[in-house]
Amino acid sequence: KKLVDTQGALTGVRNDVALAGLNHKLGWRGTTNTLLNFGEGTFPVGQGGYDGKGSGAVGYLVGQPGKGLQCMFHMMNEARIGVGMAATMLGMAGYYASLDYARNRPQGRPMGVGGKDASQPQVAIIEHADVKRMLLAQKSYCEGALALELYCARLVDEHHTAGGATADDARLLLEVLTPIAKSWPSEW
């Protein structure tokens, strides 16, 4: 929003960057994803700006010329795996809360040879077949997602520490698995 000098101190000069909107997205809802307009003259920069009309946003080169997007994706790939890991952990927390509830919530009577026995005490809902099925499905999704996230973390380590073909194989596999590691746990 405000420009900084070479020492990182605020100059008080407003950069010509304006919020155009918020994107709807999958993943961390608390981390916003925005559309920005640069250099449209909404906040004129200096005496006449960079185009002589007051518009122009100040930006900084990331990486080598023509390689900035590549640098950004390199940084974001591990963050995308982190989003998937966070979604996995939320799913695991939900599973453990569901499991605890199912173990402690009594409802219904046990089935005997002649059907339900009203003289027997109620059983926990974890004893019901449909509740068991739902808990097992929840556990399967969570543990499968965790296995995928841990495998991706291992591939990141191999990509950074292994040499030659092993590092290249890990990188190629990560290119395929990273979008899945983010989206699949976030969706389910």
Language model feature labels by segment:
Residues K1-W188:
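Internal glycine-rich alpha/beta core junctions
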